[in-house]
């Protein structure tokens, strides 16, 4: 560790002692011995210099001198680029600053920003940079023949196309496309186009346009008011007019439905619902329909049998015929009982009436025989 420096108060005190000791000495500025004595006193007061610090300082000065010498040698090889007409020099990076040799600082007319190249002209996404490689304006005949020969097989294997590369579109949409972008599909060897077709609108741009249009679009209330303002003056709407209009619309609707149903009925294309609405009496439940059919059939059979019995009873006057008819009636009744044990009240009444008639017919021959 370097020695600690003495406080300023101690230094001032020692200097005062040196002045006191040298005060009044004769020939202070002439005698060499006196000057040596004074010098020894001053050295005793001043702190001793650190040898390591002095050596480090000397080494640093030597390195700085050597570096400056090298810079002077390499400075000859560095040259500033030529500035085209109409171009701002601040848009061009200083070559001396790039090599760490520019001594002008902020006064330099060139830019000292290492990112100035990235901030320069943006790449054109509507043109393919590979199209410039095929410029043959400066080719001679020999070069042209070599290129044709080398490209003959390559062209057949990798024919150019107008299809836009999907990786290029993805990079443009994600804002990753730039001078340093490389296509994952082979870089410059990709045979798809790396340029947008004329008039192509990106999805992000389309979204911004839609948002702008939606912001300019009027609200629904404003549109309604504008449309109402465009309407011409007409009859004022009243409840009576509204009810009349409603009745008219209902009548028109009913007429249209009736016409359509009539047309469908004419073509036998009516649905079950339409048939039910037109005539509901045609439809009954399945169980009730079966019972009603059986009841009607039994009534018809009973009436027909009663008529037949009356006709037979009027023509025959013998008791044998009456007994035979009564047996037939009994057999028919048994058959009816077998067919259907449960008879309605109407059927029972009719059966009782027919039996009473047959009993009367049976009694009449007996009365005649007794007389």
Curated annotation (Swiss-Prot):
Which Pfam families does UniProt cross-reference here?
DFRP_C (PF16543), zf-CCCH (PF00642)
Give the ZnF (C3H1-type) ranges.
Answer: 88-115, 159-197
Region Disordered: start and end of each range? 1-64, 290-371
What GO cellular component is one of the record's annotations?
Answer: mitochondrion
Q: Where is the composition biased (Polar residues)?
A: 34-46
| Record-linked InterPro entries | ZC3H15/TMA46_C, Znf_CCCH, Znf_CCCH_sf
Compositional bias per record (Acidic residues), positions renumbered to this chain: 330-352
- Bias-annotated ranges (Basic and acidic residues): 10-23, 292-312
Keyword Metal-binding in record: yes
Report the domain of life of the source organism: Eukaryota
Q: MF terms per GO, please?
A: DNA binding; zinc ion binding
Keyword annotations for this protein, in alphabetical order, are:
Coiled coil, DNA-binding, Metal-binding, Repeat, Zinc, Zinc-finger
Gene3D superfamilies assigned to the protein according to its UniProt record, in alphabetical order: 6.20.400.10, Zinc finger, CCCH-type
Coiled-coil residues are: 205-237, 283-317
* PANTHER family the UniProt entry points to: ZINC FINGER CCCH DOMAIN-CONTAINING PROTEIN 21, ZINC FINGER-CONTAINING PROTEIN P48ZNF
Give the protein's recorded name. Zinc finger CCCH domain-containing protein 21
């Amino acid at each position: 560790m370097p020695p600690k420096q003495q406080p300023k108060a101690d230094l001032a005190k020692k200097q005062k002692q040196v002045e006191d000791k040298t005060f009044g000495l004769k020939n202070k500025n002439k005698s060499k011995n006196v000057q040596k004595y004074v010098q020894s006193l001053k050295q005793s007061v001043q702190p001793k210099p650190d040898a390591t610090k002095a050596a480090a300082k000397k080494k640093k000065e030597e390195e700085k001198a050597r570096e400056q010498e090298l810079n002077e040698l390499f400075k000859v090889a560095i040259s500033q680029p030529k500035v085209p007409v109409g171009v701002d020099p601040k848009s061009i990076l200083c070559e001396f600053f790039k090599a760490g040799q520019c001594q002008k600082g902020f006064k330099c007319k060139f830019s000292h920003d290492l990112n100035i190249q990235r901030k320069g002209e943006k790449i054109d996404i509507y043109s393919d940079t590979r199209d410039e490689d095929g410029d043959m304006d400066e080719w001679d005949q020999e070069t042209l023949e070599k290129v044709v020969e080398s490209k003959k097989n390559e062209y057949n294997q990798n024919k150019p196309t107008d299809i836009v590369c999907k990786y290029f579109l993805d990079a443009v949409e994600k804002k990753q496309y730039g001078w340093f972008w490389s296509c994952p599909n082979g870089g410059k060897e990709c045979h798809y186009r790396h340029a947008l077709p004329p008039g192509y609108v990106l999805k992000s741009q389309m979204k911004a346009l839609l948002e702008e249009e939606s912001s300019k679009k009027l609200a629904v209330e404003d549109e309604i008011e504008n449309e109402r303002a465009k309407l011409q003056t007409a009859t004022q709407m009243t409840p009576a007019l509204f009810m009349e209009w409603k009745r008219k619309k209902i009548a028109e609707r009913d007429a249209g439905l009736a016409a359509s149903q009539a047309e469908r009925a004419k073509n036998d294309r009516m649905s079950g619902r339409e048939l039910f609405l037109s005539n509901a009496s045609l439809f009954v439940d399945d169980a009730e329909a079966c019972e009603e059919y059986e009841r009607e059939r039994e009534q018809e059979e009973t009436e027909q049998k009663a008529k037949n019995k009356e006709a037979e009873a009027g023509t025959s006057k013998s008791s044998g015929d009456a007994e035979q008819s009564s047996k037939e009636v009994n057999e028919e009744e048994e058959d009816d009982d077998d067919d259907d044990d449960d008879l309605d009240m109407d059927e029972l009444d009719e059966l009782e009436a027919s039996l009473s008639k047959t009993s009367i017919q049976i009694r009449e021959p007996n009365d005649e025989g007794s007389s």
